[in-house]
Amino acid sequence: MIAISYLLLTLFLAGLSLWLWPRRVGRHAGARGALNASLVALLLAALSSLLLTFGQWGASSAAMADAQRIFGLAAQHISLPLLGLATVYLARGLRWKPMIWGQVILGLMACFELSRYLGWQPGYHWLVNLIGAAGLLASAVLYLSRDKRIAGLCLIAPVSLIAPTLFSQQLPLTALLSAEAGASWLLPGFVAAALAVGLLAEQAHNSDNACPSNDSTTAPR
């Protein structure tokens, strides 16, 4: 059953990545950057899940284990923060220079290494994932009266990805680092987050033709 959970997660994440890709067309540069960041988040989780699937089927080696650990750690610390930030960005109609998304990813990686060096990794792990969950919840509140589909998806995602860890007393998204029965909770969480990003990207204020009121933000009212 664990292998099936990871296989389904891999397939859904890959499919959602293919679904998100064409939604970049017609979006302004910043919105395309948010979609690209979301694709990075989904693909990191997909690669980690794929390697865990192979491991469950007995197709493991030292090189594969090392690769899985790298992608697993990256997905644990980058995927949810990027998805949460992307939903807030698209929900508010913010306009950053596209390069800022690359800087965000590099910043998350640098802070992870610093947290390991200082021995603060568990605290940093919780911090970045709670920030991602907070971003999704904020987007749910913003769209509660505008589009209940988006609000519902932004609520389902953090509940599925974070809530189970509160009861099991584990770090968030540990099922992306090692094979666990709790992997089944990841599927609805990542699916909901990806769908929310896609629907938010289609909002009028994120189109290439939308005229920003200034260079930094264009918030929906």
Model-derived features with residue positions:
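N-terminal topogenic module of multi-pass integral membrane proteins
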Residues: 1-70
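Hydrophobic cores of alpha-helical transmembrane segments in multi-pass inner/ER membrane proteins
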Residues: 5-18, 75-90, 132-142, 185-204
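Juxtamembrane "helix-exit" motif on the non-cytosolic side of transmembrane helices
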Residues: 22-24, 54-62, 112-122, 164-176
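Membrane-interface helix-boundary motifs at transmembrane edges
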Residues: 22-38, 89-100, 142-152, 206-208
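Aromatic-anchored segments of alpha-helical transmembrane domains
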Residues: 44-51, 105-116, 156-170
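C-terminal transmembrane-bundle signature of multipass membrane proteins
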Residues: 139-221
